[in-house]
Design a protein with these regions (language model features):
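N-terminal loops that bind phosphate or other acidic moieties
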Residues: 1-101
């Protein structure tokens, strides 16, 4: 995670175990938070406490605890769509939308 952060890569944190690793990385370098997104809230009992401690809001809450990266696979299209909306969607001004009645 720290090496990925140093390369300015996006970190998709998926589940409880990955969040524990993220906590360790965060304790070494808190700036890692600028590159991290929590994909989902696991059904593991401590995960909500851990994410709350880190100030993270997960993208999804589906009660998963499969340990197979499923939350990341489900969150990725949402993240990709959000990036495209931010980068490609026209503003009202650019699209010629007015308040005239």
């Amino acid at each position: 995670m720290l090496a990925a952060y140093e390369k300015n890569m996006l970190l998709l944190i998926d589940g409880f175990i990955a969040s524990c690793a993220y906590l360790c990385a965060f304790n070494i370098n808190p700036a890692i938070k600028n590159n991290a997104l929590s994909c989902h809230l696991s059904d593991e009992k401590g995960h909500a406490l851990l994410l709350n401690y880190l100030g993270e809001k997960p993208i999804l809450n589906l009660g998963l605890r499969l340990g197979e990266g499923t939350g990341c696979a489900l969150a990725y299209p949402i993240i990709e769509s959000a990036v495209r909306v931010m980068n490609e969607m026209a503003s009202f001004e650019n699209a010629g939308v007015t308040n005239k009645k």
